[in-house]
C-alpha cells in the first residue's frame, strides 16, 4: 500500500458504504466478494496506521447486514458472529499456528462446505419451530420467522430424541436450479435479475409477503447447534442435526491433522462445479466443544473457526463479438458477446469489458478464446486470454468514433468515451430506467421492461415525461390492462413527493452516487441551493472532491437539465427539502409503520417522515410517538393498543406530512 491521504481514506469508506448498500439493501452488488474483502482489508490497515482519521460511519464499525426496518429486532441467545476469511494456504497455516499456541497443543478439526447464503438462527420450543432471526449485527437480528417457515426442507416438529428446546444455526440458500427459475420469472415480469443465488436468498428473506417467499424455493443447511445438552464435538452435533431431520450439506468431515484439512480442501475444490448450490469455500472449525470454549471469540469473529475461500470459478469460451452500449450519462461501454458457457450454476453469454483502455491493456480481440469469471456481478468479466488459440488474422478492437445509437461523433475523455448528444435515445433510455429504479425514485410497476415499451411507442422520451402520463396514454399501449394502468399511475403519483437526496441520485449527475447525494442534501437543504452552489461551496463538503464538484456545476449549468427539473415541478413533483432541527416539526418523534399503505409505498412514507425530522423504527416501544396502521396491520398494532400509544391511519399521516405540522 502506497502513500494514502485522508481524502483517499474518506473515498474508500464512501465506496465501501455504497457497496454495502447495494449488497444488503438492494441485493444488486457491483463487485465480487474477493474484491470487497481486499478493499476492506486496505481500509482496516489505514485505520490501524491512522486511528485519528477513523470516522463513526466507517464500514469497519459494523458486522453483518443492516436492519431493513421492516421486521422486529430480537436479541440473539448468544453472539452470532461472522467467520474470518483466508485466501491462501499460508494464511491458513497462520490460523493453525495461532490456535495451537493458544491451546498449547494441536487439536482436531472439522471441515464443512461454506455455502454462499444467508446466516440465520432458528429456535425450537417443545420441539416445535418457534422463531427465526437474521444475523443482523451479531447481537440482535430481525425476526424473519414467516419467510423462513416457507422452507420445505426445514422440519416444523422435531423427533422425541431431540432436546425440548434448542437452536440451530444455518445458511439459507437457493439451489442453482431454483435460482435459474427465479431469474427467468424476473425476466418475464420485466424486473431486474438477481446477481447471484446469495442475493436472491437475501432478497427473499426480506419480502413482506411470505406467500411470495414460498414461491422461491429457499433451502437451508444447518452448520451449528445450541442446546443445554452439551456434546463433545461439533461433528457429533451436525450428525445429530441430520438425524433429527435437518439438511446438512456437503459431507462434513473430521480431520486429525493440518495435512488432512488441506487434502479435504483440495478434494472439495475439484468437486465444486458439480455441487447443486453455490459455495465460496470451506469452513474449518476446532472440533472439540470444550476447546472452542477455551479459545473464545473477538468482537467480530470466533477464534476457533476460519473460512478458506476459493478463487472465483473460471470457464473458457469464445468471444464472438463486442457490442457497444450507451449508459445513462452517455458513456459508451463495450460488452463481450460470448459463446454460451455454464459458470457458477448459470448460463453465461456476456461479459463486461469496461472501456477501451481495459481492452487494449488485455489485448482482447474478437474471436479470442477467453477465460471468464463470475464474482458478485450479474455480468461476469474476462480475466485472461488463451493466446495459443488466437487466430493469426485477428485484429485489435477499436471503440467506434460515432455513437452506435444516434450516430453523432463521440468525445474521448481521460478514460471513458462519451456521447454528448443530449437527444441520444440510447443514453436517455438508460437514464429513464435508472430514474425509475429502486436505486433512485423507486417507482413500483415501472421496471426496465415497461420503461422500454413506453419509450419505444413514444410516450416517454425524458424522465419528466413519466409524470405527464395519463390513463388515456397508457390505454394505447398493447398489453396494458386497467389494473396495471391504475397501479402504475398510483405509483407515479406517490413518487411526486421525493426526498432531495433521492432526486439528486435519480438525475444521473456524473460521479454523484447515493452517498454524494445525501451529503449535498444534508449540506444545502434545498434543491435551489444545490443548483446555485459554486465550485468552492461544493468542495467544502466532506467527500466532494474537485472532480465531483466540477461535474455538479457543469450539470446544472446546462439549460436542458434545468428545464427538465422545471418541467418536473410543473407536473407536480415536490422536492422535500432537508430541514434544520428548528424547522423540523417531527424532530425527535419516533414512528412505526405496520400493514400495507395505499397512497404511497413504505419507503416513500419513511423518507417523508425523515425529511421532517422524524425517525422510523421497526419495533413498537414506550418511546414510539405514533404507529401508522395500514391495511392488514398485525402484531405491532396490537402492541401499540396495549401500550396506549397514538395510532394513525394513512389519511392522518398524509395530512400531517402535507401540512408539515403535528398541531
Swiss-Prot record:
DNA ligase that catalyzes the formation of phosphodiester linkages between 5'-phosphoryl and 3'-hydroxyl groups in double-stranded DNA using NAD as a coenzyme and as the energy source for the reaction. It is essential for DNA replication and repair of damaged DNA. It catalyses: NAD(+) + (deoxyribonucleotide)n-3'-hydroxyl + 5'-phospho-(deoxyribonucleotide)m = (deoxyribonucleotide)n+m + AMP + beta-nicotinamide D-nucleotide. NAD(+) binds at residues 33-37, 82-83, 112, 135, 171, 285, 309. Residues 581-663 form the BRCT domain. Its EC number is 6.5.1.2. The active site is at 114 (n6-amp-lysine intermediate). Coiled coil: none annotated. Transmembrane segments: none annotated. The lineage of its organism: Bacteria, Pseudomonadati, Chlamydiota, Chlamydiia, Chlamydiales. GO terms for molecular function: DNA binding; DNA ligase (NAD+) activity; metal ion binding. Keywords: DNA damage, DNA repair, DNA replication, Ligase, Magnesium, Manganese, Metal-binding, NAD, Zinc. This is DNA ligase. It is an enzyme of class 6 (ligase). Its cofactor is Mg(2+); Mn(2+).
Amino acid at each position: 500500500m502506497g502513500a494514502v491521504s485522508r481524502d483517499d481514506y474518506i473515498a474508500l469508506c464512501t465506496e465501501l458504504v455504497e457497496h454495502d448498500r447495494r449488497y444488503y439493501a438492494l441485493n444488486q452488488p457491483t463487485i465480487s466478494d474477493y474484491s470487497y474483502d481486499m478493499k476492506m482489508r486496505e481500509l482496516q490497515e489505514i485505520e490501524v496506521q491512522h486511528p485519528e482519521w477513523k470516522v463513526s460511519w466507517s464500514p469497519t464499525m459494523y458486522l453483518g447486514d443492516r436492519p431493513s426496518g421492516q421486521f422486529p429486532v430480537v436479541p440473539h441467545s448468544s453472539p452470532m458472529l461472522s467467520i474470518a476469511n483466508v485466501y491462501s494456504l499460508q494464511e491458513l497455516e497462520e490460523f493453525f499456528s495461532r490456535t495451537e499456541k493458544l491451546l498449547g497443543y494441536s487439536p482436531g478439526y472439522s471441515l464443512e462446505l461454506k455455502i454462499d447464503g444467508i446466516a440465520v438462527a432458528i429456535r425450537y420450543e417443545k420441539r416445535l419451530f418457534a422463531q427465526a432471526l437474521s444475523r443482523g449485527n451479531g447481537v440482535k437480528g430481525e425476526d424473519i420467522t414467516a419467510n423462513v417457515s416457507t422452507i420445505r426442507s426445514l422440519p416444523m416438529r422435531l423427533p422425541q430424541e431431540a432436546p425440548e428446546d434448542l437452536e440451530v444455526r444455518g445458511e439459507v440458500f437457493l439451489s442453482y436450479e431454483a435460482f435459474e427459475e427465479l431469474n427467468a420469472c424476473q425476466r418475464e415480469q420485466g424486473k431486474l435479475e438477481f446477481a447471484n443465488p446469495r442475493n436472491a436468498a437475501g432478497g427473499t428473506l426480506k419480502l413482506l409477503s411470505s406467500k411470495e417467499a414460498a414461491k422461491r424455493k429457499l433451502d437451508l443447511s444447518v452448520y451449528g447447534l445450541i442446546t443445554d445438552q452439551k456434546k463433545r464435538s461439533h461433528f457429533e452435533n451436525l450428525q445429530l442435526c441430520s438425524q433429527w431431520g435437518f439438511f446438512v450439506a456437503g459431507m462434513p468431515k473430521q480431520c486429525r491433522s493440518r495435512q488432512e484439512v488441506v487434502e479435504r480442501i483440495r478434494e472439495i475444490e475439484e468437486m465444486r462445479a458439480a455441487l447443486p448450490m453455490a459455495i465460496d469455500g470451506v469452513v474449518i472449525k476446532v472440533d472439540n466443544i470444550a476447546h472452542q470454549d477455551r479459545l473464545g471469540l473477538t468482537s467480530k469473529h470466533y477464534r476457533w473457526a476460519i473460512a478458506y475461500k476459493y478463487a472465483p470459478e473460471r470457464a473458457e469460451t469464445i468471444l464472438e463479438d463486442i457490442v457497444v452500449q450507451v449508459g445513462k450519462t452517455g458513456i459508451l461501454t463495450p460488452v463481450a458477446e460470448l459463446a454460451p458457457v455454464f459458470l457458477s450454476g448459470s448460463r453465461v453469454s456476456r461479459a463486461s469489458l469496461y472501456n477501451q483502455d481495459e481492452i487494449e491493456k488485455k489485448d482482447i480481440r474478437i474471436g479470442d478464446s477467453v477465460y471468464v469469471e463470475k464474482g458478485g456481478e450479474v455480468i461476469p468479466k474476462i480475466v485472461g486470454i488463451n493466446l495459443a488459440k488466437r487466430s493469426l488474422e485477428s485484429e485489435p478492437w477499436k471503440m467506434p468514433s460515432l455513437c452506435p445509437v444516434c450516430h453523432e461523433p463521440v468525445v474521448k475523455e481521460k478514460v471513458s468515451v462519451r456521447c454528448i448528444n443530449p437527444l441520444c435515445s440510447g443514453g436517455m433510455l438508460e437514464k429513464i430506467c435508472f430514474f425509475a429504479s429502486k436505486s433512485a425514485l423507486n417507482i413500483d410497476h415501472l421496471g426496465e421492461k415497461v420503461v422500454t415499451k413506453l419509450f419505444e411507442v413514444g410516450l416517454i422520451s425524458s424522465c419528466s415525461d413519466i409524470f405527464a402520463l395519463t390513463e388515456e396514454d397508457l390505454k394505447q399501449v398493447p398489453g396494458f390492462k386497467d389494473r396495471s394502468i391504475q397501479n402504475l399511475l398510483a405509483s407515479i403519483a406517490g413518487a411526486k413527493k421525493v426526498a432531495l437526496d433521492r432526486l439528486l441520485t435519480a438525475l444521473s449527475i456524473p460521479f454523484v452516487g447515493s452517498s454524494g447525494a445525501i451529503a449535498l442534501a444534508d449540506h444545502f437543504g434545498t434543491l435551489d441551493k444545490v443548483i446555485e452552489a459554486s465550485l468552492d461551496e461544493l468542495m467544502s463538503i466532506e467527500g466532494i472532491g474537485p472532480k465531483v464538484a466540477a461535474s455538479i456545476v457543469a450539470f446544472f449549468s446546462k439549460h436542458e437539465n434545468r428545464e427538465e427539473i422545471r418541467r418536473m415541478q410543473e407536473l407536480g413533483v415536490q422536492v422535500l427539502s432537508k430541514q434544520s432541527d428548528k424547522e423540523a416539526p417531527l424532530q425527535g418523534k419516533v414512528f412505526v409503520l405496520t400493514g400495507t399503505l395505499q397512497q404511497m409505498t413504505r419507503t416513500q412514507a419513511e423518507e417523508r417522515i425523515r425529511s421532517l425530522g422524524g425517525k422510523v423504527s421497526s419495533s413498537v416501544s414506550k418511546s414510539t410517538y405514533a404507529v401508522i396502521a395500514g391495511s392488514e396491520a398485525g402484531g405491532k398494532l396490537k402492541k401499540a393498543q396495549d401500550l396506549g400509544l397514538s395510532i394513525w391511519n394513512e389519511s392522518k399521516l398524509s395530512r400531517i406530512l402535507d401540512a408539515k405540522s403535528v398541531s
